[in-house]
Amino acid sequence: MADEKKQLLIVTGMSGAGKTVVAHDLEDMGYFVVDNLPPTLLGSFWDLINNSNDFHKVAVVIDLRVKAFYTDLLDEVNSLEDNGNVQATILYLDASDDVLVARYKETRRLPPLANNGKGRLLDGIQEERRILTPIKNRSNYIVDTSNLSTKELKQKLINTFSDKKRQPFSIEVMSFGFKYGMPIDADIVMDVRFLPNPFYIPELRPFTGLDKRVFDYVMNKEETQVFYKKLLDMLETAIPGYIKEGKEKLTIAIGCTGGQHRSVSIAQQLARDLSKKYPVDITHREISRYIRK
């Protein structure tokens, strides 16, 4: 329809988190992609796009290579939306400090704020993370690429930004193991390490929460049932508030020690219950570590 707003996807986030890979993936998905656009040119660029019928899916990649420009990004986005001619969606790519350091060492490159090579890698990364906090808080989608392969990252993009009509709000329930690091893209993190652990039951230890024996052991414990009821009540109270605030995707992470038994079981049940009202995806971050070949 002629009066329908065009969609603008802004890709930003930590240097080294995968913006170049995402740009290529979006091109494969039919997006017109512009890389390294200074935020101060966003308004002029969008005027050109908006006056053309040749571009329907547009993405711009903006990073911190020019620090002075980056501080204008939120102002430019707000100005565009206030003028009413665009609906901007911000995709923020992140990764843990350890992963970013490893990636920089592998490529022998430096982050933008590494003080011209005189500062420590980690200092530059942490300063960049501090500067990007406001735009991260404003983002519609946050993707942690720390543990994603390029194939998994592309599939996540397809699931989120494909041409198929998407629900305005969706939930991702994720299980993880604290020993492998907390997921930095989670909105809500629940620690279930206090629940009885099947790891100490020899006949259950080799299996995961996807196995009925492990699932039943975890979920049938009285302390699990008391906790789970309160967790579900809390989420059913909170989720409408997230929707009211314009949240498009809510990521709920359930963590135990290794991400094998308890967190997987709780995540499975939670996804099952929440899917009665909302579109839900479920991810078991550590499951490939434990699936028997």
Curated annotation (Swiss-Prot):
Gene Ontology terms for molecular function: ATP binding; GTP binding
Name of this chain's protein: Nucleotide-binding protein LBA0691
Positions with a binding annotation for ATP: G13, M14, S15, G16, A17, G18, K19, T20
Keyword terms, alphabetized: ATP-binding, GTP-binding, Nucleotide-binding
UniProt xrefs under Pfam families: PapZ_C, RapZ-like_N
Function: Displays ATPase and GTPase activities.
SUPFAM superfamilies named among the record's database cross-references: P-loop containing nucleoside triphosphate hydrolases (SSF52540)
Family according to the record: Belongs to the RapZ-like family.
HAMAP family: RapZ_like
Native source species: Lactobacillus acidophilus (strain ATCC 700396 / NCK56 / N2 / NCFM)
Keyword GTP-binding attributed: yes
Annotated InterPro entries: P-loop_NTPase (IPR027417), RapZ-like (IPR005337), RapZ-like_N (IPR053930), RapZ_C (IPR053931)
Positions that bind GTP: D63, L64, R65, V66
PANTHER family documented for this protein: RNASE ADAPTER PROTEIN RAPZ
Gene3D superfamilies: P-loop containing nucleotide triphosphate hydrolases
